[in-house]
Amino acid sequence: MKYWIRKLAICIVLLCSLFLPTDYAGANQLSNSSNIDVQQLNALPAVKNSASVDNNLTEIRKEDFCRFNGTVNRIDKLEGLFTIYCSDDSGKIYLEIKPEQLNKDYLAIVTLESGVGESGIYSGLPLSDFLFYFRRVNNRLHFVVRNVKFRTDSRAEQRSLARSFSDSVLYSLDIITINPTNQNILINLNELLMQDFPGLSTLLKYSLQADYRLDARKSYFGDMNSFPENVEIDSIYGFSSLEGSNLVTVPDSRALNLKVHYSFSQLRENNGYIPRLADDRVGYFITAFQDFSNKNPHESYVRYINRWHLEPADPNAPLSPPKKPIVYWIENAVPLEYRDAIREGVLMWNKAFEKAGFQNAIEVQQMPDDADWQPADVHYNTIRWFNSLDAGFARGPMRVNPFTGEIVDADIIVDAKMVRLVQQEYHALMEANSSFDGHSFQVGKNPCQVLWGSQELGARNQKANTNNYLLSSSEFCYSMESSDQAAMGALALSILPDTAPSSETMKEYVHQYLRSIIAHEVGHTLGLRHNFHGSTMLAPEELNNTEITHTKGLVGSVMDYLPVNIAPQGVQQGDYFPGVVGPYDEWAIEYGYKKNPSATLEAIIPESEKSFLEQIALASPQPELSYATDEDIWDMNPLANVWDMSSDVLVYSQWQMDNARFMWQRLDKGYLSKGESYSNLRLRFNGVLKYYFRNASLLSKYIGGQSFQRLHASDDAAWAFVPVSLLKQRQALTKLQEYVFAEDAFSFSPELLNQLAPSRWEHWGSSAPNNRLDYPIHDRILSLQSAILRSLLDSDRLNRLQDIELKTLPGQALSIPELLDTLQTGIWTEVFALGEPKPISSIRRSLQREHLSILLQMMLGTTNTPEDGRTLAWYELRQLQKAIDVRLKQVSQSLDIYTLAHLEASGDRITKALNAQLLSR
């Protein structure tokens, strides 16, 4: 029997050799030159009779070889980092892995190549990037994500780490066959990439609030290629949902397709790159890990900045071109009219690199229309253009070597909506964010949270505020607010001057806007984090001086979230957006990229650069180099803001609120063109109102505020925290009283209010409100007044005021009693003022009731108010009760019924609350 089995095996091998002569020879040649892994040999069938090992092994190899070649025969072959076999008939894709590629680290970059154009599912968004390796376990191949968070130089501790912290085995794959001549492993790539590898089902559930399931029958592979250093693969996933969602951009929301691009590449090793240590005074994204061999008792983490590998061609020259510049490609999908602005935004950074010793460190090239590569290819840094219904954002993600922090890839994505709508009637850009629910309006900590929800916008905007699984809250906020800023600039451009802007003026405005956006995103791809202190470099009177802004810069850093620079009335308009990078940007690039002179003399390790880097970082106390990033703007620091400008926000905010009032006057005088819908007037009115309160909210950060600098002990004698001066705090309170709480803070003519009609279009992408149609002016004003008032009296601020009394000399701090008394006398002026009685307007009555409610909540302990705040609220209520009683006794006969009822009801509320508090004790 064995004889016939052996004969049959020989016949099969001969048949295979007839059909596969070339591959067979090639395989034998590889076998002679390759080193067969012992682990792979152990997986072969055991041979009991040692005398026949050679013969049996030869037969087994021939059978396995025939099975291997029978699988990949007559299908397309792509050779490269990993060899890919593509079967058009079956749709199967096979991946060939060499023995030496097992247990070796590779970088995976996953990108959403096509989306649905709304609700956070946008083309070009990064999905993930991580380090992985293939590990063979018996007859299966594991796809394992490497744990890079813990490291050590000690061999003994490495054994401990391996037991203590696990890698993540994402998939266990069947080994289809093994080539016996070279031990190459063949796997079915469908098992890996035709599953929901990137977790899109979770993304869709989060973003669309619906259950979508991957449908294998609708999923398939798209373009793919294999290069010597990387493999590029497209997977198209079909998703189905029984009920669907409220997507409006697809024909039927029960089914949709998403394309995902995978880039698997080998890590660049021994290329001379030296990781650079991070410093908290300079804002870089970092690669951090815990080093168990670090003997420093105060710090177990090692932090490297993320940066490109940039080396001077001439190390001895003070200014040298790089050996290999950083190249950005403008995608061929970018409209022609925007390419110059994008190019300028990228090249703005060459000025900063000159301070680091590099000439023309960055280059920009145009992607050909017939390019044979994809924008998501790891070898190309591409500025991409996409379209959406509801996004309006740009993003600049980068991918790094997780061992060293070396940036290996960066792609910037820009939504066409950011610039397209600026050119289509200036009001149109505001439409996406024009309405708001004032109860969600938050101020005093992070004005970025002033996101206006919308009944007028309908379900689409409600989703937009809750989706964005792929975008952080700050990124999504930037997208919303940046669009608003551009809209306000365009609206101001058309309203504030006596004449309408020319097409050239509007073109220049759009050019400046897009250039600024690109510069900001390129900064991220160079490794830089946000710097929300960057907008405070110039004094208010310098903002429109182009002799300064064209040389030194409009701001200290383009990495801030910058508002449009609108000149006050009577001042000639300067730059709307920055055209050059600022001093902080130059200094940060110097820290990250300047060549260490010692590097040419000896081998450099990161720790040996500490003194060199410290000399650069010592400049941090200079005002124009101040740094505050995302986690800093939640504090009450009036100089660490988003959407502010100048070193004196008090003056800047007043200028912008005056501009808003002037725009209201222009709208009141009949701004609409003949035949234009009154709904456009409502959009503009809303936009100006939002702009007004955004600037008012900046003032609240002065109350109990303090500046913060990331100083080190050797920097200088300055303090890390410096409370805002008492004078500035009092000025801020005065401005808030004048522009927010005063009786005449808001004055709109009946004619204007009666023209604020809503849009009545009802179709996909546009929802008409089904509630009251007229403009709810009382609710809008009160909700925003209430937001600012509540922020002034929240527990965090009162605790801060209490602490600051211990941090300043006597008499130099704004006390809680002064804050409460100033607000009460300003809001209840009609009660405390002497003289003839005046009727209290409806807007003032609403504000006074809100103020009273806040004090009652503080006193009755329904909030986290500190004890001193609670007793002071009791005191203020007693004073208010007495003042109301006195006023009613003096002038009750001459008061109108609105005012009389309001005062009597307010006094009664206070009396009942005071009595209730006494009973509770």
Segments the model singles out, each with a brief description of its role:
Residues 2-10:
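Bacterial N-terminal signal peptides that target proteins for export
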Residues 25-27:
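Boundary at the C-terminal end of the N-terminal hydrophobic targeting segment
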Residues 30-334, 352, 356, 361, ...:
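Auxiliary tRNA-acceptor-end handling modules of aminoacyl-tRNA synthetases
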Residues 366-386, 512-568:
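The catalytic-center signature of Zn2+-dependent metalloproteases
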